[in-house]
Amino acid sequence: KNKSSKSNEPRADIMVNCEQELKGVEIYGDKIPNLIDEIPLIGTLAMFATGKTTIRDAKELRHKESDRISLLLSNIKKFNPNTTINEYDDGFDIIPELNESNSPVEIETQGDHRIAMSFMIASLKDKKKIYIDDKRCVETSFPNFFELLKKWYQ
């Protein structure tokens, strides 16, 4: 919905219906360049999927605002300690397990806006209370993210 382009990148509004079960995915090769910025969100949502999610050929994530692969996986382990994670130089596997813990989680962002936004969205699915160590980092790319998230989720 509302498709457009900015800086040669496609943009659109996405509406998510959480009534259906998420399924694990494999993403690699020529699909990665077009999804590189979305991989942190795909990784966090993989915690709620049925089956394994595999991301490969995404080595460039090691050289963004943070080492996004390592930071994403360490925060996933905090969010759900039961999740099985395999970390590779160019990606990861996430094999989710049921998480019955409702304990609050502090998410370390290292100033990375995509990590902060991804875990805020994941917290809506799990209804887990999370603390983002640096919410202001989101202003880099999406200054009204928290305002819109609150509005959309009501």
PLM segments and residue spans:
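Short, structured segments at the rim of ligand-binding sites
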Residues: K1-Q154
